[in-house]
UniProtKB/Swiss-Prot annotation:
UniProt-annotated binding residues for NAD(+): 71-76, 105-109, 129-130, 142, 151, 169-172
Protein family (similarity comment): Belongs to the sugar phosphate cyclases superfamily. Dehydroquinate synthase family.
Assigned EC number: 4.2.3.4
PANTHER family documented for this protein: 3-DEHYDROQUINATE SYNTHASE, 3-DEHYDROQUINATE SYNTHASE, CHLOROPLASTIC
Pathway: Metabolic intermediate biosynthesis; chorismate biosynthesis; chorismate from D-erythrose 4-phosphate and phosphoenolpyruvate: step 2/7
Gene: aroB
Annotated binding of Zn(2+), by residue: E184, H248, H265
Protein name: 3-dehydroquinate synthase
Molecular function terms, GO-annotated: 3-dehydroquinate synthase activity; metal ion binding; nucleotide binding
InterPro entries: Dehydroquinate_synthase, DHQ_synth_AroB, DHQ_synth_fam, DHQS/DOIS_N, DHQS_C
């Protein structure tokens, strides 16, 4: 069992990583006998895990209600979040309730935002079931829903009480979803840790084969890296946390333009990271050899290195200008300067951004 702490003073919380955590109600601390829970999941995961997890929690003396949401990025919306509020109010649940988010990034982000809003804030626990949510979205307290004009535009910084990562969930993950999660894994190596990027080059096949030892190390290292960044810059005030958005400015444009769910988040981020790498190369920062290393590893992970053929470079910019890193109308980009190093760069000419996107057209 691996344990990591996200250090945020009185709001610090543990991340627990192991296979079989769902079998023990003690895994879900700070829950205790007598507590009331609203378990939030989706229609895909409910048949796989809901009954067994509910039984384990009830065996621990916890009172459990549930709400099952539709599955997909297109349902990460205010209207779907209202279903959670309705379920809470119908029972009813008070301020002493705990929301448990059983699912990937959509369920986790939506449930976390619902917890931040319900009666001005109730406790919630992240139980991520996808690789992407285990290494990224469940950690750090970013909660949100989408708007038709932009991804994650309505949300709050709201930290969970704990994160419970059961590696066995990855055994039921479709290969496309596994690859999507690997995009965020590779991101950590590009922006923060050259040695981890080297490790990924040597172990990507083991991760794709669901080698539990490799997965445990991979998830732990990603969570360590993110926990350190979140502890230093919880609300993206110093710029350190914004580095975690490598590829996202371009990638969110793909998701919004194509329609949420057509491209998985990790697929869009993968293409976006190559676009960012090409931008950095054009600025004379990133070497051609490092661009090729990034592309090669993404391809080995089963990820795209080009944007959608339907999207002209010019169609990216309106979405990119709605990015949360834009300041005073100036586009600011996270760019890799070498494997393991990155920076936030403002003032990049739009023509150069468009040329870099064109570099990545199929």
């Amino acid at each position: 069992m691996e344990k990591i702490t996200v250090t945020l003073g009185e709001r610090s919380y543990p991340i627990t990583i192991a296979a079989g955590l769902f079998n023990d109600p003690a895994s879900f601390k700070p829950l205790k006998a007598g507590d009331q829970v609203m378990l939030v999941t989706n229609q895909t995961l409910a048949p796989l895990y809901l009954d067994s997890l509910r039984a384990v929690l009830e065996h621990g003396g916890i009172k459990v209600d549930q709400v099952i949401l539709p599955d997909g990025e297109q349902y990460k919306s205010l209207s779907v979040m209202e279903q959670v509020f309705s379920a809470l109010l119908e029972k009813p649940h008070g301020r002493d309730t705990t929301l448990v988010a059983l699912g990937g990034g959509v369920v986790g982000d939506l449930t976390g935002f619902a917890a931040a809003c319900y009666q001005r804030g109730v406790r919630f626990i992240q139980v991520p079931t996808t690789l992407l949510s285990q290494v990224d979205s469940s950690v750090g307290g970013k909660t949100a829903v989408n708007h038709p004009l932009g991804k994650n535009m309505i949300g709050a910084f709201y930290q969970p009480a704990s994160v419970v990562v059961d590696l066995n969930c990855l055994k039921t993950l479709p290969p496309r979803e596994l690859a999507s999660g690997l995009a965020e894994v590779i991101k950590y190596g590009i922006i923060l840790d050259a040695a981890f990027f080297d490790w990924l080059e040597n172990n990507i096949d083991a991760l794709l084969a669901l080698d539990m030892s490799a997965l445990a190390y991979c998830i732990r290292r990603c969570c360590e890296l993110k926990a350190d960044v979140v502890a230093a810059d919880e609300r993206e005030e110093s710029g350190a946390r914004a580095l975690l958005n490598l590829g996202h400015t371009y990638g969110h444009a793909i998701e919004a333009e194509m329609g949420y769910g057509v491209w998985l988040h990790g697929e869009a981020v993968a293409a976006g990271m190559v676009m960012a790498a090409q931008t950095s190369r054009r600025l004379g920062q990133l070497s051609v050899s490092d661009v090729e290393r990034i592309k090669k590893l993404l391809l080995r992970a089963g990820l795209p290195v080009c944007g959608p053929k339907e999207m002209a470079p010019e169609s990216y910019l309106p979405h990119m200008m709605r990015d949360k890193k834009v300041l005073a109308g100036e586009l600011r980009l996270v760019l890799p300067t070498a494997i393991g190093k990155s920076e936030i760069r403002g003032g990049v000419a739009h023509d150069m951004v468009l040329a870099s996107i064109a570099d990545c057209r199929p």
